């Protein structure tokens, strides 16, 4: 058995995805580009850890569906615009909305709980309640959005 501990599950993978989205926004590039850069760096330098597969999947998924995710978040903001939110809150919401829409193996309450926990760890005192409220509203429409996406994929 190896002494090297694996990444601590999906919570750490989500946290790293939030970090990557934040970095991408600051650098003005897509999260997928950041993932590609990190993968190349880990390949070139064996002492640099590879990204957790879930981190890469989330970051690439958010990049691929960015417009839809941002539209969905914006539709559920009350008294705020997406660009006025703290950048870390935007990243947390984007990761969480992607999971609500595309991570069928993650129960919705787990997605919200993880987002609130990340907001507690990474953002302002008001952010956990705000994130919880926005995601609670998004959760009301995700079953219909998932069903519509499935119908499109299934050719129906």
From Swiss-Prot:
Which GO biological process entries does UniProt record here? DNA-templated transcription termination; transcription antitermination
Q: Name one GO cellular component term.
A: cytosol
Q: Which GO terms describe its molecular function?
A: RNA binding
InterPro entries named in the record: NusB-like_sf, NusB_fam, NusB_RsmB_TIM44
- Family annotation (Pfam families): NusB
Its keywords, alphabetically, are: RNA-binding, Transcription, Transcription antitermination, Transcription regulation
Q: Which domain of life is it from?
A: Bacteria
HAMAP family found in the cross-reference section: NusB
Annotated PANTHER family: ANTITERMINATION NUSB DOMAIN-CONTAINING PROTEIN, N UTILIZATION SUBSTANCE PROTEIN B-RELATED
Q: What does this protein do?
A: Involved in transcription antitermination. Required for transcription of ribosomal RNA (rRNA) genes. Binds specifically to the boxA antiterminator sequence of the ribosomal RNA (rrn) operons.
Q: Which family does it belong to?
A: Belongs to the NusB family.
- Full protein name: Transcription antitermination protein NusB
Species for this entry: Mycobacterium bovis (strain ATCC BAA-935 / AF2122/97)
Q: Which gene encodes it?
A: nusB
